[in-house]
Amino acid sequence: MSDNVVSRFFELGAKEDIDGSWECFAEDGVWITSDGPEPGKTLRGQEIRDLIVQMNELEHQIRAQGMEGVFEKPVFLSNGNQAVVEWSLRAADGTIVQRGIDLFTLRDDKIVVKDVFRKA
């Protein structure tokens, strides 16, 4: 298992470990989606776990269509309390369908904020 919480979050997600992924978040952690009324939508607590479940189900649908979600290794910013992960959704031929970044804010080896930015 990786030594940083961001990598652990993605590793556990790839294993479909819902609770393990959820436990990467601080008790007061938030996940801000790229779409919604705020702009985006801020999720907390059980809402984060529910979204992880939905994301795993979506991953199965994406793979059934011959597409793949690709997540790059996290890049930590100079203060070490923030990290950026580039990601893309690719068609079977490798064409990028969507791309974006997740901006993480960290505290005490937990995710405090996961803020998603997406280009479609």
State what each model feature region is.
Residues 2-28:
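Short acidic-aromatic low-complexity motifs
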Residues 18-20, 26-74, 78:
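A solvent-exposed, acidic/Ser-Thr-rich amphipathic alpha-helical stretch
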Residues 28, 78-82, 104-112:
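Short, solvent-exposed coil/turn segments at beta-strand boundaries
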Residues 69-71, 84, 96-102:
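Short, surface-exposed coil-to-beta transition loops
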Residues 85-92:
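Short beta-strand segments that buttress and anchor functional surface loops
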Residues 97-120:
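Short beta-strand edge/turn micro-motifs at domain boundaries
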